[in-house]
């Protein structure tokens, strides 16, 4: 009895403690907190110290100009005088009633829809042929076409030239009287076929688009070639053993593994189509510029003309805001519709 009483008393004694050297158990569902080390405490100030300067520069030179542009779009600022007054949504109403704006927006949307498709499609085809599309050689399961290194240099060459020089060269080539294109047509006894090229409202936009394609394909050929070179050759060997042809290999193996690069290139090419590249080529090559009959006017050119040619900086920033919205919508759609499961190798 005494032993039972002593045992019971020991079990109910609130002052009882675990035996020395025995770890105290934590309650179920509660994780033991690990004390923060000195490295953990110093990590966040270290990261913040590296980010604060780039973020400050980004805010000053990117975010703040956007805010200013949106503010000036509600004014009648001429761009030459410090004096202006608020006009509310007057500039936006003027923009929606402006036929030239809608023509320019149509041309810009045409560029942003077609240029990425054409440029990336050609670049993917050429990259595949350079890296994978050649005949089998001894000691290599896959190989590119002969002279692939030379082709990479040739395709990338337009990137070395200034866009202004490229536009001037093609402007001379498109000259209906002394240009290279019509001279070639006359040389093959097609003298009756002498298009006006940049002087024809039905051809001018497509002639300029062809120049943009020529200047940009080489960059993406090199970009996609680098991506294809990083794909393990064992994957291609397995596909060949399974009897896959080039068409199947490209769409079932190469393209899925390059999809992240293609998606980024799509956004980048779309921004170029809406930005400085399109503006420079249209400004230099087209009649007017922007002609004939506004057949080649794009939104960046219209912004330039309104701000610096007609002294309507407030209205020009309104068109710039519309261009920003189009760019954001395009980027969002590409990132959303192009989302797919990430493949790793």
Regions found by a protein language model. Give the residues of each.
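Short, Lys/Arg-rich, polar N-terminal cytosolic tail immediately upstream
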Residues: 1-41
